Amino acid sequence: MASPTDFPDLKAPHPSHTGPTAIPLWRPHRAPSPPLTTVSERTKHKIMEKPLILISNDDGITAKGITELVRMVSPLGTVIVCAPDGPRSGRSRAFSLTPLTLTPFSAPQHSGGDVTWYSCNGTPVDCVKMAFALLCPRKPSLVIGGINHGDNASTNAHYSGTMGIAFEGTIKGVPSVAFSLCDYDADADFRPMEDIVRRVCRHVLTDGLPKGVCLNVNVPKAGTASDLRGVRICRMAQGGWHNEVEKIEGDIDESGRQRYILKGYYRNYEPEAEDTDAWALANGYVAVTPCTNDMTAYAMEERLQGIITGQGQDCRLS
């Protein structure tokens, strides 16, 4: 994983898989092919065969990143956008238990052709759920989160609403990708990553992904596409936030309670590890990290079995 690469064989079983067969490959959904008898039916069938792509984000439907993403991928299929009506960063996989609404949204200028836009008053995951239930005429071929303003690399991916979109897509049986740019500027330049976005999406639409696996694609800030040094398939770097809670001086609520805000700084615990997404980004590479919905710690199964049954050589958790 330490050397630059294009896209390796994503059909291989997950390293933790110990069964006799490989994890099945998800193929992009295609509508059935009924007999065609008239021109109108042929036209309708052609439209149905066009890949359906669902897009959402966590920066909100007015963010530049989602408009740029739609522009980049709209040539690849029919696009449905369902995104939060305002910023919902850090919502991860949260969904709402309160009433939700959908509102038609006027397509931003230069955002692409065959696109339907809706905003939702919920979380990013709410948007995916609402779109599947109410907006998509058939099962999508691809679910995309992004493009996020700011990276979602390392353990930060756990907090990401952009990644929550991709994980929700995999839960629903659809190949899914999250895209992020390492630039928090509201007017960030997304053009240098256009080629990588289209290449990844074409790859997934053509070859699918292993069941339960989505891709987390992080792109470093670059002046031009040629400034990107290449693509690395990486693991997630380990790190954490420090000095996270900051007192807001002089800010007391109506009940007399002090207000605080989460800030702090992020520390990479393994900055020298060249096989991580954090290293790739710091050195000018696009980082592609395969992520899985399966949270099982397979290495613990046998040891826990011994603890529960009282058998086995090692019944300790440490």
Residue ranges and their predicted role:
Residues 32-47:
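Short, Lys/Arg-enriched N-terminal segments with co-localized hydrophobic residues
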Residues 131-137, 164-175:
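Alpha-helix C-terminal capping segments
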Residues 49-56, 64-139:
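A cross-family phosphate/adenosyl-ligand binding-site feature
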Residues 191-318:
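Electrostatically charged, flexible surface regions
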Residues 151-160:
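Glycine/threonine-rich flexible loop motifs
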Residues 170-192:
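Glycine-rich phosphate/pyrophosphate-binding loops
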Residues 15-18, 30:
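Short hydrophobic alpha-helical segments enriched in small aliphatic residues
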